[in-house]
C-alpha cells in the first residue's frame, strides 16, 4: 500500500517532470485515498512551487514552467469534476498583474502570473506596456485584492508609484494591496513609494501574496 507521503511525492515529481500523463496517473491514484484539496495543495501546488525555485536557479526554463502549469491545470480539472456539486477550488485572492506603460518586456511577469495561478489565486494578466489607469480600472472591474506591477527599466519604475497614487485618488488603496517587482525595483523602492511588498522573483511573489492575502 502506497503511503500518502509517497503519493504526494509522486504528484510533486510528476509536476516537476512537466509530463501531463504522469500527473493524471498520479492524480488517479491519489484520489482513492485523499481529498481533492489535499492533493492540490500538498501535491500539485508543492510541485509547482519547486518548479518556480528551479526556474529561478536556471535549472528549468520558460517552456518547462508553462508545461508544468498546463499539467497542473489538467490535474486540477480532473479533481474538480469529482467534487460534489456546488463546491469548487477555493481561490486565495484576486490579483491583477501587468507590466507598466513604456515597458515591453513581460517574460518575468508572465512567470509570476503562472505561478500565482498555480498557487490558487485568480489572476488577471493585463499584459505589458499597460497604461496606469488600466491597472486600477481592471482591479475595480474584477474586485481585486491585489495589483502586481512589474517594471523592467529604471525609466518605467515611476509607473509603479503612479498606480499607487491613482489607487489613493480612487479611494481604493485600503482595499487593494500592491506588490512591485522587476530588475530595477528593490525593497527600499517599495518602501519609498508605499507598496505593500516587493518580490524579487516568482517564488517570492507567491509567498508574499499568500502572506498578505491569506495569512491574516
Curated annotation (Swiss-Prot):
The keyword Secreted does not apply. InterPro entries: Cbl-bd_cap (IPR003759), Cobalamin-bd (IPR006158), Cobalamin-bd_sf (IPR036724), Corrinoid_p (IPR012741), Dimeth_corrin_MtbC (IPR048095), Met_Synthase/Corrinoid (IPR050554), Meth_synthase_dom (IPR036594). GO terms for molecular function: cobalamin binding; cobalt ion binding; methionine synthase activity. The keyword Metal-binding applies. GO terms for biological process: homocysteine metabolic process; methanogenesis; tetrahydrofolate metabolic process. It comes from the Archaea. Keywords: Cobalt, Metal-binding, Methanogenesis, Repeat. Pathway: One-carbon metabolism; methanogenesis from dimethylamine. Residues 1-91 form the B12-binding N-terminal domain. One of its GO terms (cellular component) is cytosol. Methylcob(III)alamin binds at residue 105. Residues 92-216 form the B12-binding domain. NCBIfam families: dimeth_corrin_MtbC (NF041607), pyl_corrinoid (TIGR02370). Belongs to the methylamine corrinoid protein family. Acts as a methyl group carrier between MtbB and MtbA. This is Dimethylamine corrinoid protein 1. It comes from Methanosarcina mazei (strain ATCC BAA-159 / DSM 3647 / Goe1 / Go1 / JCM 11833 / OCM 88). The gene is mtbC1.
Amino acid at each position: 500500500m502506497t503511503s500518502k507521503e509517497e503519493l504526494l511525492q509522486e504528484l510533486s515529481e510528476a509536476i516537476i517532470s512537466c509530463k501531463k500523463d504522469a500527473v493524471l496517473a498520479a492524480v488517479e491514484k491519489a484520489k482513492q485515498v485523499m481529498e481533492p484539496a489535499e492533493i492540490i495543495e500538498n501535491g500539485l501546488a508543492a510541485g509547482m512551487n519547486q518548479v518556480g525555485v528551479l526556474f529561478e536557479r536556471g535549472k528549468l526554463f520558460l517552456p518547462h514552467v508553462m508545461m508544468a502549469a498546463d499539467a497542473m491545470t489538467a490535474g486540477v480539472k480532473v479533481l474538480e469534476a469529482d467534487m460534489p456539486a456546488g463546491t469548487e477550488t477555493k481561490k486565495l485572492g484576486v490579483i491583477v498583474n501587468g507590466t507598466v506603460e513604456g515597458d515591453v518586456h513581460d517574460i518575468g511577469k508572465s512567470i509570476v502570473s503562472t505561478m500565482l495561478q498555480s498557487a490558487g489565486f485568480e489572476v488577471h494578466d493585463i499584459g505589458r506596456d499597460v497604461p496606469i489607469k488600466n491597472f486600477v480600472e481592471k482591479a475595480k472591474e474584477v474586485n481585486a485584492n491585489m495589483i502586481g506591477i512589474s517594471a523592467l527599466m529604471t525609466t518605467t519604475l515611476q509607473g509603479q508609484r503612479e498606480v499607487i497614487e491613482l489607487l489613493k485618488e480612487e479611494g481604493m488603496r485600503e482595499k487593494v494591496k500592491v506588490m512591485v517587482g522587476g530588475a530595477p525595483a528593490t525593497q527600499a523602492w517599495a518602501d519609498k513609494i508605499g507598496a505593500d511588498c516587493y518580490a524579487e522573483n516568482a517564488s517570492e511573489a507567491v509567498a508574499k501574496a499568500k502572506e498578505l492575502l491569506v495569512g491574516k
